[in-house]
Amino acid sequence: MAVATSVTRCGARRCAAALLWGAALGAGLGPAWAQPAPAYVAVPAGTLASVLTNDATQEDVKVPAFAMRTTPVTQGDFLRFVQAQPLWQRDQVPRTFADAGYLQDWDTANRLADADAAQRPVTHVSWFAAQAYCESEGGRLPTWTEWEYAAAADATRRDARSDPAWLARILGWYARPASAALPAVGSSSPNLYGVRDLHGLVWEWVDDFNALLVNADSRSGDDPDKLKFCGAGAINLQDKQNYAVLMRIALLSSLNASDSTSSLGFRCVRPNLKATP
């Protein structure tokens, strides 16, 4: 319980790095492991009128250049990861780092449900597991700002959010009933940067998910201490017409780092210099 509390109340990434990799390296497991090279594309620097703004300012956010995985991490990718790093297998991972639903859709701890699953996005993964995976391939989870910046682009524009037709299409994706099985990653068309599946496939973890809190006047949360702890991280919501993004904020801000769901996956980012063709 003491460990879980400390993880909740410090920067989640900072706590995870010390706890998770200390345990992994102590067991002789390092971040390097063999796998097919994932595809990353460069996302150039720019500015973003984020739906999240600090109380003190409503200026656009400057976003440094970075590289992003073109698609979410697949079940096949994650299977190779847990085979190389058994700490993250569902029958080995401590409950502090993953809840009882972790990888529950797999056949066993080391086998996917069916042959087609390898190309589907991995879900039922905790924030801790997602962050550990990204670090294992030399990356990390994107910040909310990085994810929002990349997701604002369509095929030809850096920011398509003012286009009602674009917003309607995205909302249409989210309104579809859930299917029995998720489709393979990469099924959607790439955006301006070459990134796919930012909308319409799965929700995605971000590094700073636990800072995505609206201010006390605009939410009826039952944990006022959480708002006090976040302090300057408490935010106001702008652009309330962008319901698809607001739904993501509502989901992510309700989660703990050990939670996993059937609709939540992730992708990784790297420094821009590590982008791959």
Give residue ranges: language-model regions:
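Disulfide-stabilized, aromatic/cysteine-rich ligand-recognition loop
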Residues: A34-A39, R120-P121, V125-W127, G139, ...
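Mature N-terminal segment immediately following signal peptide/propeptide cleavage
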Residues: Y40-T47
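Bacterial N-terminal signal peptides
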Residues: A16-G28
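Active-site microenvironments of metalloenzymes and redox enzymes
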Residues: K62-W166, R270-K274
